[in-house]
Amino acid sequence: ADVPGNYPLDKDGNTYTCLELGENKDCQKVCKLHGVQYGYCYAFFCWCKELDDKDVSV
C-alpha cells in the first residue's frame, strides 16, 4: 500500500532538493516546517510522510 504523503514546496513553489537519500536531517527539518513529523530524501527531493495537500506550501 502506498503511504500517503507529498513533496513539500518552498515559498517560491519549488521542491526541496536533497543529496543524501533516505533518512535526511534537512528533509526532517523541512517536513517539521510543514507540520509533519517525518520525511526523507526520495529521488533527490524531500518527501514528507502524511503531508496533506493544504500543507504542501508554507
UniProtKB/Swiss-Prot annotation:
SUPFAM superfamilies: Scorpion toxin-like (SSF57095). The keyword Secreted applies. Disulfide bonds join 18-41, 27-46, 31-48. CDD domains: neurotoxins_LC_scorpion (cd23106). Signal peptide: none annotated. Keywords: Disulfide bond, Ion channel impairing toxin, Neurotoxin, Secreted, Toxin, Voltage-gated sodium channel impairing toxin. Residues 3-58 form the LCN-type CS-alpha/beta domain. It comes from the Eukaryota. Expressed by the venom gland. InterPro entries: LCN-type_CS_alpha_beta_dom (IPR044062), Scorpion_toxin-like_sf (IPR036574), Scorpion_toxinL/defensin (IPR002061). It is found in: Secreted. It holds the Pfam family Toxin_3. GO terms for cellular component: extracellular region. GO terms for molecular function: sodium channel inhibitor activity; toxin activity. Beta toxins bind voltage-independently at site-4 of sodium channels (Nav) and shift the voltage of activation toward more negative potentials thereby affecting sodium channel activation and promoting spontaneous and repetitive firing. In mice, causes akinesia, depression and death. Belongs to the long (3 C-C) scorpion toxin superfamily. Sodium channel inhibitor family. Beta subfamily. Has the structural arrangement of an alpha-helix connected to antiparallel beta-sheets by disulfide bonds (CS-alpha/beta). This is Altitoxin. It comes from Parabuthus transvaalicus (Transvaal thick-tailed scorpion).
